[in-house]
Amino acid sequence: MSTLKKPDLSDPKLRAKLAKGMGHNYYGEPAWPNDLLYIFPVVILGTIACVVGLAVLDPAMLGDKANPFATPLEILPEWYLYPVFQILRVVPNKLLGIALQTLIPLGLMILPFIENVNKFSNPFRRPIAMSVFLFGTFLTIYLGIGACLPIDKSLTLGLF
């Protein structure tokens, strides 16, 4: 199946539109000059206006003065490392924690071979890939929230 839509030039209505110069809207707008000269600058200037507006309305406050001799009670990594930190913190054997983290890329490499019989690209028609994605997303969010809590409340998220 081709991704290009070819015009049916035997259609008299389409030939009449093309004769009047009205046919390009039927197949899509040209990128030059419509997108590059009109739409892109509006999006770029709008993004800059949003960033400047947020910086003016809610400036970043300065935190406490740095003291190299005072160590905080609990040192947390950057936010994108919270799930990894939680795995290493909860698993009793650190080697097992590292092995669990190597299973994630291995599972992602195996997933296309499990789902190769499915020819659909729509994610709602690929139940295995969708369920693995949703499970991984919820597990990552769960581990990330648990990393922000004390160790005794991290597995139950303080709910029980």
Curated annotation (Swiss-Prot):
One of its GO terms (molecular function) is electron transporter, transferring electrons within cytochrome b6/f complex of photosystem II activity. It is a multi-pass membrane protein. The chain crosses the membrane at residues 36-56, 95-115, 128-148. GO terms for cellular component: plasma membrane-derived thylakoid membrane. It is found in: Cellular thylakoid membrane. Belongs to the cytochrome b family. PetD subfamily. The 4 large subunits of the cytochrome b6-f complex are cytochrome b6, subunit IV (17 kDa polypeptide, PetD), cytochrome f and the Rieske protein, while the 4 small subunits are PetG, PetL, PetM and PetN. The complex functions as a dimer. This is Cytochrome b6-f complex subunit 4. The lineage of its organism: Bacteria, Bacillati, Cyanobacteriota, Cyanophyceae, Synechococcales.
